């Protein structure tokens, strides 16, 4: 039955009509993930966070114009550098240009300084004259009273002029600063930065391409990484997420190569996130402590992903891991074409695989297993709804041909190269 809720095209942002890896993100990342913060379904509900925030800032709205959903918004005020850089003083004709006022202040500053300096010097000169007349008052019958009165008046006049010039200059500067500060506050109130809070959690948000590697990092991250290397703890690995797109390939933008990275978190034996019929999934992946040690994982590649339809999909949080474990589960399938020295290998070792969590608004989880070029290949059943391709640069190595399916097809390194398997988690793990 046709699913009318499924999108027929690739996942793109509703505003810029571009995919996840089509635009640079914060100047460092390969692309920006798509989020679904409103109730619109399909690609109509997908946004780049930066595009949505820019649109809400320009339109001064907080609701979706289609579903009328009220976005959860957090606002942040812009600084004065943004005000100057974006030309906020040009929004109204009544606003004065701060650069012109600043140039005018710089122009009159030397004149004001010279006027105050000369006034103070005149007051000091009059004070010295008064002091000389006062010291020689006995030589004059009037006690140099006329000279003393004149110098006192001159000193007071010079001090008044100096104070007047200084007050006028300070008043001019303060008034200019207050005017531009008021202009800036009005612009700041009308041009706040809006941060959209995604209504869905990390699992329910739709991420359509593999997670990219985090670039750089601050000094805290570097110290934590160095301390982790000293204690020999595994570094954090980002979870690759593969989207459901109803058998429509997601073509990445030319020139951008997403990186498939494995997640190495351990699942507990009593967790509902594991297959209870397969205890080997809970084993610790000895010898595989970091993503860099995994074969054919964390290599730049160009993925073409075909996801599974919504059939028997179950909800489970991110943290599921198809661990890089060495299982010794006895295989009951027949083996053929095996050399005599390897004929005793009935306990097949599981291949290294990545557990990928995917959901469309919390509707499903899929397991993704990537074959490794070694002597123990895991067979991939050719099914149009459960088989995906992943072009990788695995080195060519000789491998023993093993037949693990009933179709009689021979599984070789060439036939299994660059493929990964998408499995649906059944509901029987709760039983």
Swiss-Prot record:
Q: Which UniProt keywords apply?
A: Cell membrane, Endosome, Fertilization, Membrane, Metal-binding, Transferase, Transmembrane, Transmembrane helix, Ubl conjugation pathway, Zinc, Zinc-finger
Which GO BP terms, alphabetically?
protein polyubiquitination; protein ubiquitination; single fertilization
Q: Which reaction is the catalytic activity of this chain?
A: S-ubiquitinyl-[E2 ubiquitin-conjugating enzyme]-L-cysteine + [acceptor protein]-L-lysine = [E2 ubiquitin-conjugating enzyme]-L-cysteine + N(6)-ubiquitinyl-[acceptor protein]-L-lysine
Top-level EC class as recorded in UniProt: transferase
Residues that bind Zn(2+) 2: 38, 40, 64, 67
Main subcellular location of this protein, as a coarse class: membrane
* EC number(s) from the headed UniProt entry: 2.3.2.27
Protein origin, superkingdom: Eukaryota
Give the molecular function GO annotations: ubiquitin-protein transferase activity; zinc ion binding
Function of the molecule: E3 ubiquitin-protein ligase which positively regulates the fast polyspermy block during fertilization, preventing entry of more than one sperm into the oocyte. After fertilization, required in the zygote for the selective degradation of a subset of maternal membrane proteins including cav-1, chs-1 and rme-2, probably by mediating their K63-linked polyubiquitination.
**Designated name of the protein:** E3 ubiquitin-protein ligase marc-3
Question: Native species of this protein?
Answer: Caenorhabditis elegans
The root-end lineage is: Eukaryota, Metazoa, Ecdysozoa, Nematoda, Chromadorea
Q: Which gene encodes it?
A: marc-3
